From Swiss-Prot:
The gene is aspS. It catalyses: tRNA(Asp) + L-aspartate + ATP = L-aspartyl-tRNA(Asp) + AMP + diphosphate. The keyword Ligase applies. It comes from the Bacteria. The keyword Cytoplasm applies. Transmembrane segments: none annotated. InterPro entries: Aa-tRNA-synt_II, aa-tRNA-synth_II, aa-tRNA-synth_II/BPL/LPL, Asp-tRNA-ligase_1, Asp-tRNA-ligase_1_N, Asp/Asn-tRNA-synth_IIb, AspRS_core, GAD-like_sf. HAMAP family: Asp_tRNA_synth_type1 (MF_00044). GO terms for biological process: aspartyl-tRNA aminoacylation. Keywords: Aminoacyl-tRNA synthetase, ATP-binding, Cytoplasm, Ligase, Nucleotide-binding, Protein biosynthesis. Catalyzes the attachment of L-aspartate to tRNA(Asp) in a two-step reaction: L-aspartate is first activated by ATP to form Asp-AMP and then transferred to the acceptor end of tRNA(Asp). This is Aspartate--tRNA ligase. It comes from Streptococcus equi subsp. zooepidemicus (strain H70).
């Protein structure tokens, strides 16, 4: 029989109609000779009533066989419920069953199919098809579909062209590790799965496409955390002849449209802009969460002359003030914060508490001479807790930035209903890699340096600034973009600054350098992490919750057992051998 509608769509206006529904048995209850079934489908739950006085013996026998997650087809008439259930959208009605067919049976599931069930992440991923039956999971994917629909319509209306770029590309040395794909035809050679369509979308600008977009899969072989996956989806944009501001205006309009159409929230435009240095110095992060204060304070000069070498000899001494919560943190709690601080390179964590106008704590005795200045500078009051880090400026900023976020979560200081967008601009072009012992691109090597700092490509690389911009939401980097290099000589200078020889640059990027000899227009763009955006819209804290079949923290899939061994025959065809090292 043809399904009349979704179970979750049945309402009062359908009373008196005979309909056919199909779905899963969510729950069965036997009460006073009647059998009650909660039928679940994609759109919700509907109560079925099976009365032995109204159905044949066969139907009743079938009903008695029903168990959770059986797939069934039912026919019956919609009636008003004697006692409405306000918790259900269908709670005013029920279906009086006249016909029932079991379409498939089900084993006892490894966990109950309902929201809020306690089950391990690996079990959820092992039985992902069951996990996805839960209503909150379905809602997340409806939200994701709505988000991509809004984005496509918005960009289509602005004249952007949706173009698919290759999945098998050339491996490049910058950035994260590539996922490599061996070529059977060109043996000994490898493709790479794209970390982004960066170069190909730039080449589309050279081709005259003017405005490109793509909702595209990307791949990075990197260590995983809550907001990262080895394969992820991004909203990729590129434009020709537009300024940094014009590109940001387009992106802001897109985000505003998504927020209005998916959440019913009007966001204020334009988004605030914050310089990279200000973000690091005041928030300790290049992706600051501006929903709460607790700013980093620089005390380096104030404590320079005190008799406490940890402070007086440090490159930087910075602090955060936890207002009015000193009594919430015992010595044991502060020890935990100290261990947390060490994860970010800090040697330790100094602290003091303010009680009735006096300082208490291990370092209080060293601060006697600057107590009044410190109180005034930090605007200290009774029951304040002050946490200090004395180290390099980078370590102090990073450590206190992480502590700031951790403490705000512990103390419920964050308004979770807020969506605070901002742009982080004025980025450094390069960042120093301790591991590589060289400067590397802060974004990528195709980013345009500012006209004022480009001369430092042959001088002090720390002084080179980029025409780059990141969009940030609630402490998460949603995406990043920049104006790109379109002149061959500038691109060659960039490669030299990164340590490429002319031969290496030509081997890796010769096709791009050649393209720059054929009228490459000024261009720029941006990419936004779709998974991360939907995660935040859905109020989740892990992008696995908005990816249908994600990997676990070991980059493996407990359901399919990927990655897996392959046969010797497959390896022979590729002329590959696996060496095992103890």
């Amino acid at each position: 029989m043809k399904r009349s509608m979704y179970a979750g769509h049945v309402r009062k206006e359908h009373i008196g109609r005979t309909i056919v529904l199909k779905g899963w048995v969510s729950r069965r209850r036997d009460l006073g000779g009647l059998i009650f079934i909660d039928l679940r489908d994609r759109e919700g739950v509907m109560q079925l009533v099976i009365n032995p006085e109204d159905v044949s013996g066969d139907v009743m026998a079938t009903a008695e066989r029903l168990r959770s997650e059986y797939v069934i087809e039912v026919e019956g008439s919609v009636e008003a419920r004697q006692q409405a259930n306000d918790k259900l959208a269908t709670g005013a009605v029920e279906l009086k069953v006249s016909g029932l067919t079991i379409l498939n049976t089900a084993k006892t599931t490894p966990f109950e199919i309902k929201d809020g069930v306690e089950v391990s992440d690996d079990t959820r991923l092992r039985y992902r098809y069951l996990d996805l039956r839960r209503p909150e999971m379905l809602e997340s994917f409806k939200l994701r579909a709505k988000t991509t629909h809004v984005i496509r319509n918005y960009l289509d209306n602005l004249g952007f062209i949706d173009v698919e770029t290759p999945m098998l590309t050339k491996s490049t040395p910058e950035g994260a590790r590539d996922y490599l794909v061996p070529s059977r035809i060109s043996q000994g050679h490898f493709y790479a799965l794209p970390q982004s369509p960066q170069i190909t979308k730039q080449l589309l600008m050279n081709a005259g496409f003017d405005r490109y977009y793509q909702i595209v899969k990307c791949f990075r072989d990197e260590d995983l955390r809550g907001d990262r996956q080895p394969e992820f989806t991004q909203v990729d944009l590129e434009t020709s002849f537009l300024s940094e501001q014009e590109i940001q205006d387009i992106v802001e309009g897109m985000i505003a449209k998504v927020m209005k159409d998916t959440k019913g929230i009007e966001v204020k435009l334009p988004f605030p802009r914050m310089a990279y240095d200000d973000a690091m110095n005041h928030y300790g992060s290049d992706k600051p969460d501006t929903r709460f204060d607790m700013f980093l304070q620089d005390l380096t000069d104030l404590v320079k002359e005190i008799d406490f070498k940890v402070f007086s000899e440090a490159q930087a001494v910075k602090a955060i003030v936890v207002k009015g919560h000193a009594d919430r943190y015992s010595r044991k709690d502060i020890d935990k914060l100290t261990e947390f601080a060490k994860q970010f390179g800090a040697k330790g964590l100094a602290w003091l508490k303010v009680a009735d106008g006096a300082f208490t704590g291990p370092i209080a005795k060293f601060l006697t001479g600057v107590e009044s200045k410190l109180t005034e500078s930090l605007q200290l009051e009774h029951n304040d807790l002050v946490l200090f880090v004395a180290d390099t400026l980078e370590v102090a900023n990073n450590t206190l930035g992480a502590l700031r976020t951790r403490i705000a979560k512990e103390l419920d200081m964050i308004d979770m209903s807020q969506f605070n967008f901002l742009w982080v601009v004025d980025w450094p072009m390069f960042e120093w890699s301790e591991e590589e012992e060289r400067y590397m691109s802060a974004h990528h090597p195709f980013t345009l340096p500012t006209a004022e700092s480009a001369h430092e490509l042959e001088g002090d690389l720390a002084k080179v600034r980029a025409v780059a911009y990141d969009i940030v939401l609630n402490g998460y980097e949603l995406g990043g973009g920049s104006l790109r290099i379109n002149q061959k000589d500038m691109q060659e200078r960039m490669f030299r600054a990164l340590g490429f020889t002319a031969e290496e640059a030509n081997e890796q990027f010769g096709f791009l350098l050649e393209a720059m000899e054929y009228g490459f227009p000024p261009h720029g763009g941006l990419a936004i992490g779709l998974d991360r955006l939907v995660m935040l819209l859905a109020g989740k804290d892990n992008i696995r919750e908005v990816i249908a079949f994600p990997k676990n923290n070991k980059a493996s899939d407990p359901m399919t057992q990927a990655p897996s061994l392959v046969s010797e025959k497959q390896l022979e065809e590729l002329q590959l051998q696996i060496e095992h090292h103890d």
